Amino acid sequence: MKHKRTLATEIPPEVKAIVWERDDRKCIFCRRYVPMFFANAHYIKRSQGGLGIPENIFTACDRCHREEDAGKNSLKYRDIAKKHLQEKCPNWDEEKLYYKKGMELDERF
């Protein structure tokens, strides 16, 4: 059985579908079309307790996702992702993107 934090930070299929449509089925960085599988990038990383909710997830192709995660321009990519999420999610609040101990899974949305 998975731990609550693991469940809270993974991205459910319905969230991937919402994010992929919201992001026009394209990588938010290079604007190339990508399959729905690529709606899988966390703004607040899973390792930091980033929730698998639309406000924390964006669509990125493999190349851009790697660059955003650990490339020499990762801060630039993160800034673009933050602005994108703020624009697409009117009530975006970075503090609400983290898993908090005792949080129920249905509190994510």
Give the positions of each predicted feature.
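Polybasic, low-complexity binding patches
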Residues: 3-7, 47-58, 66-109
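Intrinsically disordered, low-complexity segments enriched in polar/charged residues with Gly/Pro
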Residues: 31, 45-46
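Short Cys/His-rich "knuckle" micro-motifs
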Residues: 36-43, 70-74
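Generic detector of short, locally flexible boundary/turn motifs and exposed helical patches
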Residues: 5, 25-26, 43
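Short cysteine-rich loop/turn motifs with clustered Cys
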Residues: 10-39, 61-63
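Generic preference for hydrophobic/aromatic residues in regular secondary structure cores
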Residues: 1, 34-36, 81
